[in-house]
Curated annotation (Swiss-Prot):
This is Nucleoside diphosphate kinase. The lineage of its organism: Bacteria, Pseudomonadati, Pseudomonadota, Alphaproteobacteria, Rhodobacterales. Coiled coil: none annotated. One of its GO terms (molecular function) is ATP binding. Homotetramer. Its EC number is 2.7.4.6. It holds the Pfam family NDK. It is found in: Cytoplasm. Belongs to the NDK family. SMART domains: NDK. Disulfide bonds: none annotated. It comes from the Bacteria. CDD domains: NDPk_I (cd04413).
Length: 140
């Protein structure tokens, strides 16, 4: 399997509860390396641009307001099959459907406040990483 990079966002519900370290431990235990990381506070306009693919979905306003409500941690994870592995570690979008031991099963408050975001494909991973990081910030 190829070495990949994927974007991970630790969302406001998790940063507010100081879960960054516990969440990152799960990524590292799964064999993913954190090759870039920063804590930022998105503006509403930035959140709307990042989640623009969902602009016509009914949850867009609630999602973007939530993502701009408090700081988030954006990071790049690297490893063999990193995109699929990250999604496995995160668990199902709805924590009620997530497997035991996943981030969302352990830490998510609801389907809306589900603690983490992860890229879903190589193309979106590249776009999402470039949204937050320059090449100089990626050290692996």
């Amino acid at each position: 399997m190829a070495i990949e990079r994927t974007l991970s966002i630790i969302k406001p519900d998790a940063t507010r509860r100081n879960l960054t370290g516990k969440i990152n431990a799960k990524f590292e235990e799964a064999g993913l390396r954190i090759v870039a990381q920063k804590r930022i506070h998105l503006s509403l306009a930035q959140a709307q641009k990042f989640y623009g693919v969902h602009k016509d979905r009914p949850f867009f306003g609630e999602l973007t307001e939530f993502m701009a409500s408090e700081p988030v941690v954006v990071q790049v994870l690297e490893g063999e099959g990193a995109i699929a592995k990250n999604r496995e570690v995160m668990g199902a979008t709805n924590p009620a459907n997530a497997d035991a031991g996943t981030i969302r099963k352990e830490f998510a408050l609801s389907v809306g406040e589900n603690s983490v975001h992860g890229s879903d494909a190589p193309e979106t991973a590249a776009e999402e990483i470039a949204f937050f990081f320059s090449g100089l910030e990626l050290v692996g």
